[in-house]
Amino acid sequence: MSCSTESRSISESDAYNKVFNITKKYMHENIIVYNKRIDSTMRGNVGIEIDAMLDALDDDRIAIVSPAYPSAGRTVVGGYLLVNGVLVEDTEMAVDSKNPIKISNVIDLIKAQSKRKIISMSIDIVRKSVKVIANFIKDKYEEGFRIFVCDMINENHINSISQAVLESKIKFIVADPSPLTAKISELSITPPRIMSREKYYAL
């Protein structure tokens, strides 16, 4: 199930209310994967909308966040968003007429809008085993972190993070342009069962 909020270029309060209300309306205990789709160049009310979905679900889950889309040239390294190897603030996105991006640090962008404790899942962690990544998530969850901003350069990182999120057994949402959500959703299906509409929810 997918709902379009058209909230990228509206006020923060309106964006929050749209995401919060739609999540409340359609949330269900059988949904495995909640996705807050975000722009791969971080335009819009990203932090606000992540908070809105987490607030609506109200079960102390985490947000796994990355604007990376490796196959489209979007990567995150050291917390910085690169577009075809160039910092996003040095691309045409910096002069976007509606949502100019002046900062390439993903954590700084989200911190400016979110009330939650944020941590970077750096490339040093992402390159390690699934078990190490899962333990990192669990340990930092116990320390109070609720938003995990993931470095991501290639498909291997997408696979490892996806497996680790599920292995951690911690409830989550995913905020990304789609590749991470797609992989987690794929791994959430136990063949030959087919995912029903109740299993996946995206905004």
Stretch-by-stretch model annotation:
Residues 13-15, 21-34, 40-158:
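Cap/lid and interdomain-hinge subdomains that line or gate substrate/regulatory clefts
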Residues 161-163:
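Long, charged alpha-helical interface segments
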Residues 1-13:
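Short, structured active-site "lid" loops
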Residues 2-4, 64-66, 147-151, 173-175, ...:
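Structural motif
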Residues 165-203:
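Acidic, glycine-rich loop-and-beta core segments that form the ion-binding/anion-interacting portion
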Residues 7-9, 39-41, 155, 179-180:
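Short glycine-rich anion-binding loops that position phosphate/pyrophosphate groups of nucleotides
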